[in-house]
């Protein structure tokens, strides 16, 4: 499959960080984050354990491996070949474990760009996930949604995250650059924060209303949308030091998610959308 030159900075960055990616996200905050993510995703798992699922922009395979462990035939795909190497290493470890070895045969690992999924069959998947803001950081969010729509079976579910436009305003305020703030508010577009110019790529941010409108325009019905993380616990690790801190924070975050306007202060938005039957 031909590579899209516009996506090379994205690929370069993720190739470079692949080997240390899991360590970057190994702390109590990310455990909190991942529990919230899974709690929202879990109700949309296919009831049929033979249903095909895809982890799009899978990175090192965190969510795809959970799906595979649940028995689903799982396709892991990412723009970065180095990220897929990390997935394959984990699958190789699974082969040595009697309780997991049989599930490895249900895994497919294949490089692909989120805006070009021609390599995969139409109307084949019951569930596609795209965590890590794949829709935000790909070169064309609308095209990505169209590609996923083509891959999903009628009634299939796409669960994904995007960066929240409203939450990013504080970054531009802190920088004190009025021109940059105005450009961002008007476009919802910024650049990946990395010092290496060769690794800088566009990031598309969305308000709740904007992402709802885009998915509907691409033929999806919005089933559920939450803001996360509404509680900015990453800013103070002391919150995790008390007994049962994780469970308390999960309960509070979940309570806040029931208030639709709370999404305005969340760093990300997570949606479950359905392809019409």
Placement of each model-derived feature along the sequence:
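Acceptor-substrate binding/catalytic loop of class I
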Residues: 195-210
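A short glycine-rich, Lys/Arg-flanked "PGG" loop and its adjoining helix->strand segment in the class I
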Residues: 142-157
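A short acidic, Gly/Pro-enriched loop at the edge of an enzyme's catalytic core
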Residues: 115-127
């Amino acid at each position: 499959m031909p590579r899209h030159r516009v996506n090379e900075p994205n690929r370069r960055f993720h190739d470079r960080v692949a080997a240390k990616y899991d360590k970057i996200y190994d702390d109590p905050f990310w455990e909190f984050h991942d529990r919230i993510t899974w709690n929202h995703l879990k109700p949309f798992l296919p009831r049929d354990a033979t249903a095909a699922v895809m982890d799009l922009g899978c990175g090192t395979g965190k969510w795809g491996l959970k799906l595979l462990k649940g028995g689903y035939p799982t396709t892991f795909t990412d723009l970065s070949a180095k990220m897929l190497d990390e997935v394959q290493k984990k699958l190789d470890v699974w082969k040595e474990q009697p309780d997991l070895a049989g599930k490895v045969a249900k895994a497919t690992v294949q490089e692909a760009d989120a805006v070009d999924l021609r390599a995969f069959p139409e109307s084949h998947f019951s569930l596609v996930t795209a965590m890590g803001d794949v829709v935000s950081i790909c070169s064309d969010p609308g095209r990505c949604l169209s590609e996923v729509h083509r891959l999903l079976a009628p009634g299939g579910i796409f669960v994904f995250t995007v960066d929240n436009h409203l939450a990013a305003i504080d970054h531009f305020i802190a920088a004190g650059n009025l021109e940059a703030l105005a450009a961002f508010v008007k476009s919802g577009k910024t650049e990946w924060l990395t010092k290496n110019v060769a690794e800088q790529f566009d990031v598309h941010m969305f308000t709740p209303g904007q992402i709802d409108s885009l998915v509907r325009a691409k033929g999806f019905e919005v089933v559920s949308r939450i803001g996360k993380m509404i509680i900015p616990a990453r800013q103070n690790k002391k919150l995790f030091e008390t007994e049962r801190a994780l469970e308390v924070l999960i309960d509070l975050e979940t309570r806040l998610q029931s208030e639709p306007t709370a999404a305005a202060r969340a760093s990300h938005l997570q949606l479950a959308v359905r392809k019409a039957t």
